[in-house]
Amino acid sequence: MKKGIHPEFDLVVFEDMAGNQFLTRSTKIPKETTTFEGKEYPVIKVAVSSKSHPFYTGEQRFVDTAGRVDKFNKKFNLGKK
């Protein structure tokens, strides 16, 4: 491989919104850091991961879409006439 043309590929911690963390490698190196297994690593925050996604956990979660629609209609005065 040629030197100087490839991005750095370092260890980072990915953390989902549920607080689950896992260590992997990435070319994206953020400034924010966290401690994982006693060492300091850069951290990338993600919404969901394989530890929290319903497909991988087998949990069913109900999303309140009806409440969201009502909130939208109320916000823009689109209620029933």
Swiss-Prot record:
GO terms for molecular function: rRNA binding; structural constituent of ribosome. Keywords: Ribonucleoprotein, Ribosomal protein, RNA-binding, rRNA-binding. Pfam families: Ribosomal_L31. InterPro entries: Ribosomal_bL28/bL31-like_sf, Ribosomal_bL31, Ribosomal_bL31_B, Ribosomal_bL31_sf. One of its GO terms (biological process) is translation. SUPFAM superfamilies: L28p-like (SSF143800). GO terms for cellular component: ribonucleoprotein complex; ribosome. Part of the 50S ribosomal subunit. Binds the 23S rRNA. Belongs to the bacterial ribosomal protein bL31 family. Type A subfamily. This is Large ribosomal subunit protein bL31. It comes from Fusobacterium nucleatum subsp. nucleatum (strain ATCC 25586 / DSM 15643 / BCRC 10681 / CIP 101130 / JCM 8532 / KCTC 2640 / LMG 13131 / VPI 4355).
